[in-house]
Design a protein with these regions (language model features):
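N-terminal lobe of the biotin/lipoate ligase/transferase fold
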Residues: 1-84, 101, 148-158, 165, ...
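Residue-level signal for inorganic ion chemistry
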Residues: 47, 71, 92, 117, ...
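Structural motif
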Residues: 95-96, 223
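Short, acidic (Asp/Glu-rich) active-site segment that either coordinates a divalent metal cofactor
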Residues: 110-154
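Conserved, helical-rich catalytic subdomain that frames metal- and/or nucleotide-binding sites
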Residues: 145-227, 231
Length: 258
């Protein structure tokens, strides 16, 4: 994402574009958590898509939800197992309740910078406790064995310069997914959209599994450690949940870790 931000400095009329990295060592997730690529094999997708804020056809509070619904079908088409794909509010993609893709959206002047990380060939180990704690991860190759058969790992591993061109040439699944995502976002920006459509599309894929809130970065600290059940979205994109322990409903307006 930082590389993409550097590219748009001093370029006021730059159109939609994307940057793909072969690996990342300064990656970040929500709430400042780190998001690093594996040191063994460069087989996952790390990309950034940049476009003008003025081109977004829905309120900005709904943009994370819409971006998630655009990326989800690109991943869904690559699942050949009987596994189920869900969206976790506000913009994570899950397969069988395990995280396969994360999305981070930042605003830079009048540009929207969308960072996307998708586990294609391998699922990184995620801490279960501490500041870097997160959901168990999965990868596309676990749900589509053909993905591994279409990768020339020898060329990737011997590419000491880590040139993205070589990575994409030897990794058709990676390139195909990146192209699909960019095309989906581009088509969306060129067409009309409505808040009701965003909410409907997200709720159709939203996970309704009972989960436990584990982050301490909450406005309502009484929710820490509580078991919750996602219920519905408000018009502004915030999430209404039921607190199981207290049998009450409340609204979440910021990302939480569960």
């Amino acid at each position: 994402m930082d590389k993409a931000k550097d590219m748009i400095k001093g370029t006021p009329n730059i159109p939609l574009f994307s940057v793909i990295a072969g690996s990342q060592n300064k990656g970040r997730g929500t709430r400042g958590r780190t998001w690093l690529s594996s040191s063994s094999i460069n087989g996952n997708l790390y990309m950034t898509v940049v476009f003008k804020m003025s081109a977004v056809p829905v309120p900005l509070t709904l943009m994370p939800l819409r971006v998630a619904t655009l990326i989800a079908p690109c991943i869904q088409r690559r699942i050949t197992s009987s596994s189920s794909l869900y969206l976790k509010w506000p913009n994570d993609v899950l397969i069988d309740n395990e995280k396969v893709c994360g999305i981070l959206i930042e605003i830079d002047d009048d540009n929207v910078v969308v960072g996307i990380g998708c586990n294609v060939c391998e699922a990184p180990t995620v801490d279960s406790n501490g500041a870097e704690a997160g959901r168990v991860s999965t990868c596309l190759s676990k749900h589509n064995k053909d993905i591994l058969n279409n990768v020339d790992y020898d060329s990737i591993v011997t590419n000491t310069d880590n040139k993205v061109e070589t990575l994409l040439e030897t990794h058709p699944p990676l390139l195909g997914l990146a192209v699909d995502i960019v095309e989906a976002i581009d088509i969306w920006l060129q067409n009309k959209d409505t808040p009701s459509s965003v909410l409907k599309d997200f709720e159709e894929k939203m996970t309704t599994a009972t989960q436990r809130i584990r982050t301490d970065r909450l406005v309502d600290q009484s929710l820490l450690g509580k078991e919750i059940l996602p219920l519905r979205l408000n018009n502004d994109g915030s999430l209404v949940v039921r607190v199981i322990d207290d049998n009450r409903d409340t609204t979440l307006v910021a990302d939480y870790l569960w």
